[in-house]
Swiss-Prot record:
Glycosylation sites: N33, N89
A Pfam family this chain is assigned to: Lectin_legB
Signal peptide: 1-21
Protein name: Arcelin-2
Coiled coil: none
Native species: Phaseolus vulgaris (Kidney bean)
One annotated GO biological process: defense response
Lineage: Eukaryota, Viridiplantae, Streptophyta, Embryophyta, Tracheophyta
Family to which this protein belongs: Belongs to the leguminous lectin family.
Length: 265
């Protein structure tokens, strides 16, 4: 009888362990609406369902806008020492008034939940200093129209990896972006394609997200426009999908369950 009770208790605890699994996430946005977004600064949604990050309709300079998915995303589960992998696909269009002298660019970013806009200009609304700031807890993939390159920024506007990409040459054209993060190797990869010109750009870096961002993050976009009328540009996101999963969870969960059973039985 005692053995039977112990077995029942063990099975209950295993089921409880399974119930407390990490939170995978997935969404697909073909047309944006304000109900599933946190909009900050000048960001808004057009009648066509496009995400408009910067406002330069009246040649306003120094515009900044941020938009994040309304639900927080779990990146790290410290209870089982498990880090999520993720992938995101989106399309965007940057339209500069003067494609040879425009600023500043657009970024896809992981930021703290409840984060507020930071400095404008080259800081892209994501950072308050050029130096490494661990408290920023922000990782961003930046499409830098000043330097015509893709950057990977980790808690600083000083990139840890860059690759040239001619945004000026593709002014006003739709770009297709895919970003993947493979957690077992901390491998962050970015690929961009301009279908109209067939130009491709790639960049990658090793980023230990468990050390650089908080366990729960907001995912989304931030952009800033030039501080002079001749350098203004618009940043529109046309579609967006995101998926995250704890790919090692099943193995770790089984191992944890077996340890629990062995200790009890």
């Amino acid at each position: 009888m005692a053995s039977s009770n112990l077995l029942t208790l063990a099975l209950f605890l295993v089921l409880l362990t399974h119930a407390n699994s990490s939170n995978d996430a997935s969404f697909n946005v073909e047309t944006f609406n304000k109900t599933n977004l946190i909009l900050q600064g000048d960001a808004t949604v057009s009648s066509e369902g496009h995400l408009l990050l910067t406002n330069v309709k009246g040649n306003e300079e120094d515009s900044m806008g941020r938009a994040f998915y309304s639900a927080p995303i779990q990146i790290n589960d410290r209870t089982i020492d498990n880090l999520a992998s993720f992938s995101t696909n989106f399309t965007f269009r940057i339209n500069a008034k003067n494609n040879e002298n425009s600023a500043y660019g657009l970024a896809f970013a992981l930021v703290p939940v409840g984060s507020r806009p930071k400095l404008k200009g080259r800081y892209l609304g994501l950072f308050n200093t050029a130096n490494y700031d661990r408290d920023a807890h922000t990782v961003a993939v930046v499409f830098d129209t000043v330097s015509n390159r893709i950057e990977i920024d980790v808690n600083s506007i000083r990139p840890i990896a860059t690759e040239s990409c001619n945004f000026g040459h593709n002014n006003g054209e739709k770009a297709e972006v895919r970003i993947t993060y493979y957690s077992p190797k901390n491998d962050l990869r970015v690929s961009l394609l301009y279908p109209s010109s067939e130009e491709k750009c790639h960049v990658s870096a090793t980023v230990p997200l468990e050390k650089e961002v908080e366990d729960w993050v907001s995912v989304g976009f931030s952009a800033t426009s030039g501080s002079k009328k001749e350098t203004t540009e618009t940043h529109n996101v046309l579609s967006w999908s995101f998926s995250s999963n704890f790919i090692n969870f099943e193995g770790k969960k089984s191992e944890r369950s077996n340890i629990l059973l062995n200790k009890i039985l």
